[in-house]
Amino acid sequence: MTSVSLVTGAAGFIGSNLVEHLLDQGHSVVCVDNESANNEKFHWSHENGMVINVKVDITDYKGMKNIMSGVDYVFHLAAESRLQSAIMNPIEAVKKNCVGTTVMLQCAREAGVKRFVYSSTSSGYGNNPYPNVETQPDDCLNPYSASKIAGEKFCKMYRDLYGLETVVFRYFNVFGNRSPARGQYAPVIGIFQRQKDAGLSLIHI
C-alpha cells in the first residue's frame, strides 16, 4: 500500500526537493503551501495522481484538519525563515513558527499520523562554541531562532504527553536545486560554486 506523506512548505527550496524525493520513493504526496514567499509556486500538476496541491496556511486549524485524514507521515518545513522579517515582526514569526507548528502537531495527533518530522535550525546554537553538538544548551539570539526552537519543545511535548512520534532536524547551510541564487538568503556554498564556475576567486577581500 502506498504511503501518504504531507509536506508543508512544499513550494519552497527544501520542500520542493523533498517532494521530488518522496515521489521517487513511491509516496503519494500532499503538498501544502500558502505560496506567500517570492517566486514560490507549486512545481507539480494536479494531473499527477501521486500529488495533491493544497494552498492553505499552517495556522488554519480547520483547513489543516480537513487534509490530514489518511496521512501517514508529516514533514513540516513551512515557517517564517527570513531572519530580518522575524526581527522586524516577531509576532508574525511566533504565529507562523510556534502557533503553526502546534496546529500541525495537533492535527497530526488527531489523524493518527505515524511520524512527524520537524525542520528546525542550527541558529538555535547561537554563540555556543564549535563544533556544535546536540547536548549544548539553546542560545536563541533572535525571534527566528527562538520561535523555531520553541517548535522543537512542542515536538518533544507531543511525543512525551501524547505519544506522537516526532523527529527534529536542525539544518545548517543547505544548498541545492532551486536554492536562492542571490540576495541575503542565498546559501554561501552556492555562492562559492557560482564564483568557481565563473572562474573567480571564492572570496574577494
Can you say where each PLM-predicted feature lies in the sequence?
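N-terminal Rossmann-like NAD(P)+-binding domain of SDR-like oxidoreductases, especially those catalyzing
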Residues: 1-174, 196
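Glycine/proline-rich active-site loop of Rossmann-fold NAD(P)-dependent oxidoreductases
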Residues: 149, 174-190, 198-200
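Conserved small/polar residues in nucleotide/adenosyl-binding loops
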Residues: 203-205
